[in-house]
Swiss-Prot record:
UniProt binding sites for 5-amino-6-(D-ribitylamino)uracil: 31, 63-65, 85-87, 118
Superkingdom field: Bacteria
Pathway where this protein functions: Cofactor biosynthesis; riboflavin biosynthesis; riboflavin from 2-hydroxy-3-oxobutyl phosphate and 5-amino-6-(D-ribitylamino)uracil: step 1/2
Record bears the keyword Lyase: no
Protein name, entry field: 6,7-dimethyl-8-ribityllumazine synthase
Gene, per the UniProt record: ribH
Length: 161
């Protein structure tokens, strides 16, 4: 499983005075509702763990639209998290959407200096998405992980602003 070797970042060990003041936006795609609901629940749980009770949450149609939404939000927030699911089909569409979302979100983060948590699942099967969505019985919680990474990075970057 891809989570092997992942860092153990506990948001509760970060300074709550720092994390609770962070402005967090979560941009969530709409395809694959069950998986997306799990990702979003995990992301909101991580925000709450960090003392952020009401992050801004917006929905976009799909993963292809995540970068433009993140770009619009980034200047107004300390961290942005992008959540989406792309499942391989029988055409090259999978590669195009995955590449566009990945490079677009990376570009937003580097260009704005705002961490963008990458919670876009790129799966060969729906089961792989379910296994990573933080649902009961899931092996991983990528929504939680994406928020944790973005907020931990935002705390580090605040030290250098």
């Amino acid at each position: 499983m891809s989570g092997h070797g992942a860092p153990d970042i506990d948001l509760t060990t970060l300074n709550p005075a720092e994390t609770s003041q962070l402005r967090l936006a979560i941009v969530a795609a709409s395809w694959h509702t069950q998986i997306m609901d799990g990702l979003l629940d995990g992301a909101l749980r991580a925000a709450k763990d960090a003392g952020i009770n009401e992050p801004t949450v917006i929905r976009v149609p799909g993963s292809f639209e995540l970068p433009v939404a993140a770009a619009r939000l980034a200047p107004h927030f300390d961290a942005v998290v992008a959540l989406g699911v792309v499942i391989r089909g029988g055409t090259p569409h999978f590669e195009y959407v995955c590449q566009a979302a990945t490079s677009g979100l990376t570009d937003v983060s580097v260009r704005t200096g705002v961490p963008v948590g990458f919670g876009v699942l790129t799966c060969d099967t729906e089961q792989q998405g379910l296994d990573r969505a933080g649902l009961p019985g899931s092996k991983e919680d990528k929504g939680h992980e994406a928020v944790t990474a973005a907020l931990a990075t935002a705390v580090v970057l605040k030290q250098y602003s």
